[in-house]
C-alpha cells in the first residue's frame, strides 16, 4: 500500500498519564491523507499533549500510536529515521543569529546532500509560497512579528530530499493565531491551509480562536475530561 493510501495518524486506546491522573484516557483517532484537523478544548484539557505525542516529544503511557503506518515506540530524537512531522510553534522559534535563509534551510544544510545553490533555490521557493520576498539575507530581529511567523511557515515547507515524491508530511500548528489581531489572524489562517496544501500533507491545529478553527480545519475534535468528546466537521 502506498503512503498516500495509508492513514497518516492512528491512535488506538491511547492513554497519557501524569502521575495518577490521565490527561488522555483511552482515546482513539484516525487521520487520512490530506485531512485538516483542529483540536479544541478548555485550557489544561490535553490539547498540547496530543501535539507533543504526534511530534514524538512524548510517548503514551499505554495504547498504540502509529504515524504513516509505523508504530511510535521511541521518542523522535531516539529514532534513526523519524516520520516527517513538522511543528509550527506559537512563537516562531527562529534562531536570532542566523539569517532568514539560514533559518529556513537549516535542516538541508545539516544533511549536507544539496549544494548551497540548490538550498538557496528551495528556500526562495518556500519564502515566496508564504508571501515573503527579498528577506532571505535579513535577520529575524529585523522583521515584524507577522513576518517572523511567515518564516516559520516557510521552514515547515522545506522538504527532506531523501524522501520520495509520495512523502506526505504531518504539519502541527500550536496556537498559531494566539494574540494576533483579526486581520493578521485571517492571513495566518489562509497560510495554514496554503502551507498544508503546498506541502501535500495533512495538518493538526490546536487553537482556541474560533475563526482559526472554522477556517483552517475541515474536522474538529474536542478534548475534555481526558476523552475526545466529539468529532465532526
Where are these regions (language model features)?
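H-loop/switch region of ABC-family ATPase nucleotide-binding domains
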Residues: 207-208
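The feature captures the beta-strand-to-loop junction immediately N-terminal to the Walker
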Residues: 40-42
Amino acid at each position: 500500500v502506498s503512503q498516500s493510501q495509508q492513514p497518516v495518524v492512528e491512535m488506538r486506546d491511547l492513554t497519557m498519564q501524569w502521575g495518577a491522573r490521565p490527561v488522555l484516557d483511552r482515546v482513539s483517532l484516525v487521520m487520512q491523507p490530506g485531512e485538516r484537523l483542529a483540536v479544541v478544548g478548555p485550557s489544561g484539557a490535553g490539547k498540547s499533549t496530543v501535539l507533543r505525542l504526534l511530534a514524538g516529544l512524548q510517548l503514551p503511557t499505554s495504547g498504540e500510536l502509529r504515524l504513516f503506518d509505523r508504530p511510535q515506540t521511541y521518542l523522535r530524537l531516539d529514532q534513526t529515521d523519524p516520520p516527517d512531522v513538522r511543528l509550527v510553534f506559537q512563537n516562531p522559534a527562529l534562531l536570532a543569529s542566523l539569517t532568514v535563509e539560514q533559518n529556513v534551510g537549516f535542516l538541508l544544510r545539516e544533511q549536507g546532500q544539496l549544494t548551497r545553490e540548490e538550498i538557496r533555490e528551495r528556500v526562495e521557493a518556500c519564502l515566496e509560497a508564504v508571501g515573503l520576498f527579498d528577506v532571505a539575507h535579513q535577520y529575524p530581529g529585523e522583521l515584524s512579528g507577522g513576518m517572523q511567523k511567515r518564516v516559520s511557515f516557510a521552514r515547515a515547507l522545506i522538504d527532506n530530499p531523501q524522501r520520495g515524491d509520495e512523502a506526505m508530511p504531518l504539519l502541527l500548528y500550536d496556537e498559531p493565531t494566539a494574540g494576533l489581531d483579526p486581520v493578521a489572524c485571517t492571513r495566518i489562517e489562509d497560510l495554514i491551509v496554503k502551507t498544508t496544501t503546498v506541502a501535500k500533507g495533512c495538518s493538526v491545529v490546536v487553537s482556541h480562536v474560533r475563526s482559526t478553527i472554522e477556517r483552517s480545519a475541515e474536522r474538529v475534535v474536542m478534548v475534555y475530561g481526558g476523552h475526545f468528546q466529539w468529532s465532526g466537521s
